């Protein structure tokens, strides 16, 4: 079944129905609320009603200058320009409706007062999904990796050059997948940067063909329980530390910049991409949401609707589009 965008008049009628909260939900009724914004703008109560829905809300906007679009589009979780884009979001939401709803609800909170508040909210939501059926199904379907792990590999190269601290992700054989060991090494290096005011610049890049291919999938599901996982994420947070040195941080990205790769990079004051860089948020397909700070760092750069589009659609974003959206600051 594919969601069809409701005409504005029909959508307004549905939103006035006291049963709308259950009619559009991941656990009852339709998992997506899609509306074509054309015609008379109508009811001013639309923004309030949209915020109450448990399902992601999508505005189909063919003409951005239409009165309804100008008045209401900003209140939806995602804005799409065509039926094909709507279909892309619809397929993702139907595959993992609970994770999709949690993402939309989290992004609706808007910009928190502090970095810590945003990271805690994201981690709590992420932990809830770690215990959910969609993530468990993804884990069960994933083949076990036969590759043994090397306990001796150094995941991060650290070099001091005058007033600059250079950090290089160095798991090239795994496309710099963000493992627990890499997180710990990055946290230690960023703690140094945060505590040493003689470090004028922190430069972060990656060795090998990719900046970072996202979380190390071989470690997914290894946390003893979701509560402990939340405690670990909020105790050892590279995102929080990178944000604390934001004004001194330069991140250079190339190749795959996936999941945690772009989530962390987006906290830096300046992100420079090579032309071959591409960006993706694949977590929804695993029954999760971005969990390395992305629900905080990306909206601050590109807004919540574009963040939701990236996460819900799973599309790859090229460097030119990333620059146009201001996800990166330059292409070199």
Question: What residue spans do the PLM features occupy?
Answer:
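Crotonase-fold acyl-CoA enzyme core
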Residues: 63-93, 243-332
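Short, active-site-adjacent cap segments at secondary-structure transitions
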Residues: 105, 209-212, 258
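A structural preference for short, pocket-lining loop segments at secondary-structure junctions
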Residues: 20-35, 56-58, 63, 162, ...
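Amphipathic alpha-helical segments at domain termini/boundaries
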Residues: 1-46, 52-166, 309-332
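Charged catalytic carboxylate motif
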Residues: 102, 181, 185, 234, ...
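A generic structural signal for short coil/turn motifs at secondary-structure boundaries
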Residues: 175-178
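Active-site-proximal gating segment of KS-fold condensing enzymes and close homologs
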Residues: 229-233
């Amino acid at each position: 079944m594919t969601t069809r965008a409701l005409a504005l008049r029909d959508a307004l009628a549905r939103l006035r129905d006291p049963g709308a909260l259950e009619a559009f939900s991941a656990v009852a009724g339709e998992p997506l609320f899609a509306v074509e914004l054309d015609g008379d703008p109508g009811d001013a109560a639309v923004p309030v009603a949209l915020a109450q829905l448990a399902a992601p809300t999508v505005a189909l906007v063919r003409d951005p200058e239409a009165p309804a679009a100008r008045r209401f589009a900003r209140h939806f979780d995602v804005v799409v320009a065509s039926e094909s884009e709507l279909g892309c979001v619809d397929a993702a939401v139907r595959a993992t409706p609970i994770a999709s709803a949690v993402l939309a609800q989290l992004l609706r909170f808007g910009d928190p007062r502090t970095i810590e508040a945003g990271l805690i909210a994201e981690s709590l939501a992420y932990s809830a999904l770690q215990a959910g059926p969609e993530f468990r199904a993804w884990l069960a379907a994933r083949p076990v990796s036969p590759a043994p792990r090397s306990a001796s590999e150094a995941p991060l190269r650290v070099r001091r050059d005058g007033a600059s601290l250079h950090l290089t992700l160095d798991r090239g054989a795994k496309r710099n997948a963000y493992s627990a060991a890499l997180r710990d090494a990055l946290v230690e290096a960023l703690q140094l940067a945060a505590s040493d005011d003689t470090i004028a610049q922190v430069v972060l890049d990656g060795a090998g063909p990719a900046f970072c291919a996202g979380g190390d999938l071989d470690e997914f599901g290894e946390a003893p329980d979701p509560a402990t996982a939340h405690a670990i994420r909020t105790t050892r947070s590279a995102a929080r530390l990178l944000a604390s040195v934001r004004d001194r941080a330069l991140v250079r990205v190339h190749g795959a910049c996936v999941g945690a790769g772009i989530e962390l990079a987006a906290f830096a004051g300046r992100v420079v991409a090579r032309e071959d860089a591409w960006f993706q948020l694949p977590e929804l397909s695993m029954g999760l949401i971005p969990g390395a700070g992305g629900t905080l760092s990306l909206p601050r750069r590109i807004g919540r609707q574009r963040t939701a589009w990236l996460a819900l659609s799973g599309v790859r974003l090229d460097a030119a589009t990333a620059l146009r959206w201001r996800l990166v600051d330059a292409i070199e």
